[in-house]
Amino acid sequence: MRGLDQFLSTFTNRIDKKGRVSVPADWRAVLAARQSVGVLLFPAVYEPAIQGAGQDYLAELDRDIDALPRGSAERDDLIYTLKPSIRAFQWDSEGRLVLNDDLIAYAKLDEVATFVGLGQWFQIWRPEAWAVREAEAKQRVRAPRARPTT
């Protein structure tokens, strides 16, 4: 059934003083179905959030990089931006990840984190920042569009 293999929905969970936050159980099941031992986390390129994905993301990233001309600035920038910042994390027996200080600072997380499902990957946001980003996206989607005339 489609959907069970994707990161869907939105969850807000507390971050404890040790930087631990619970990964949504549905998402741990998605990662397990993908035979991902843990989760990859890195600073999102275009958003003030943490990007997350299963290990299968690396193959997708490599395909995207390989499609770019060798030696091109775009290819090099993509490699230099993403590859060094990707880290593998595993959750504990209670389904919690320990976020490192760099990721917490990048996303400006404090006591809570909002997990946002985006299909093949997810992001972890400061709740207030996500509310603004979500509202902007919904406003653009709902904006009247010019319809073709016949």
Where are these regions (language model features)?
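Flexible "stalk/tail and boundary" regions
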Residues: 1-12, 17-20, 27-94, 101-150
